[in-house]
Amino acid sequence: MFPTIRSCARGTSTPADNYMLARRRTLQVVVSSLLTEAGFDSAEKAAVESLTEMLQSYLSEIGRSAKSYCEHTARTQPTLPDIVVTLIEMGFNVDSLPAYAKRSQRMVITAPPVTNNPVVPKALSAGDNKPHPAHIPSHFPEFPDPHTYIKTPTYREPVCDYQVLREKAASQRRDVERALTRFMAKTGETQSLFKDDTSTFPLIAARPLSIPYLNALLPSELELQQVDETDSSEQDDQTDTENLSLHLQGDEVGMEKENASVLQQNSMKGGEETLIDNPYLRPVKKPKLRRKK
């Protein structure tokens, strides 16, 4: 129960060592009071240490024997009968204990001053410290503050302010427009404000394509490759088709001339009326009714 205190360097003591050192000093106070009752005015330090060691060994033996008797009867905590049996086995007269406790010249050892725990400011405290479980002795140091070992997840609250949302949407729209204009400036035709440096302040060319659907009508590269891989017989057929196309073009030219002459005649006949190619936009003409004879 009272293990021997080992000497430790200053500044390297643990809470357990401090606790055992306090118990050792308590035994020294008890030995000093017993020497005072016996009539001694002073004692050497070595003598006090020897008597303290003897008292510590005696009390340790009492505790060890009481513990063994307790475990022998299938119990975990020693009781008063266990201590009485231990004292009897060690040759101590148990009947003299009441008279010794009631002696008149005994010295009363005052309790040590109670040191209050330092008050931690509320600004530095985070939560309440948990008490020790049943299996941890009370003289052990307290648990640290909960914020040192408890994990608290953090998250941002969603922004619900209308003004902030509008500003965020406007900034996103502006960023998208800038990215799109930069992409168009790098991939398409651009115009520059400065003749010397064309890369500074590029402007997207505002000239639309003359025939926007021309790309859709042109053959793709795959079709051109297939045409190149055709046989020589297909080339002959192509020449025939070219000749036919020339004849057709000649016929088309003749037809265009005839249409032009017809249009001129119609324009001469009806100056106010204009020829409209779209049949849905032409003026309505009433059919002529034939009279019955």
Curated annotation (Swiss-Prot):
Where is this gene product found? Nucleus; Cytoplasm
Asked if the Swiss-Prot or TrEMBL record annotates the protein with the keyword Glycoprotein, the reply is no
One Pfam short name: TAF8_C
**Keywords noted in UniProt:** Cytoplasm, Developmental protein, Differentiation, Nucleus, Transcription, Transcription regulation
Instruction: Give a GO cellular-component term.
Output: transcription factor TFIID complex
Chief location = nucleus
Residue ranges of domain Histone-fold in the record: 25-92
Q: Which InterPro entries match?
A: BTP, Histone-fold, TAF8, TFIID_su8_C
An example of a GO molecular function for this protein is: protein heterodimerization activity
For whether the record's keyword set contains Transcription regulation, the answer is: yes
Start and end residues of each stretch annotated as Disordered: 247-293
Gene Ontology terms: biological process: cell differentiation; transcription initiation at RNA polymerase II promoter
- Residue stretches of biased makeup (Basic residues): 283-293
Motif Nuclear localization signal mapped to chain: 280-293
Q: What does this protein do?
A: The TFIID basal transcription factor complex plays a major role in the initiation of RNA polymerase II (Pol II)-dependent transcription. TFIID recognizes and binds promoters with or without a TATA box via its subunit tbp, a TATA-box-binding protein, and promotes assembly of the pre-initiation complex (PIC). The TFIID complex consists of tbp and TBP-associated factors (TAFs). Mediates both basal and activator-dependent transcription.
Per UniProt, subunit arrangement is: Component of the TFIID basal transcription factor complex, composed of TATA-box-binding protein tbp, and a number of TBP-associated factors (TAFs).
* Stated family: Belongs to the TAF8 family.
Q: What is this protein called?
A: Transcription initiation factor TFIID subunit 8
Organism, as annotated? Xenopus laevis (African clawed frog)
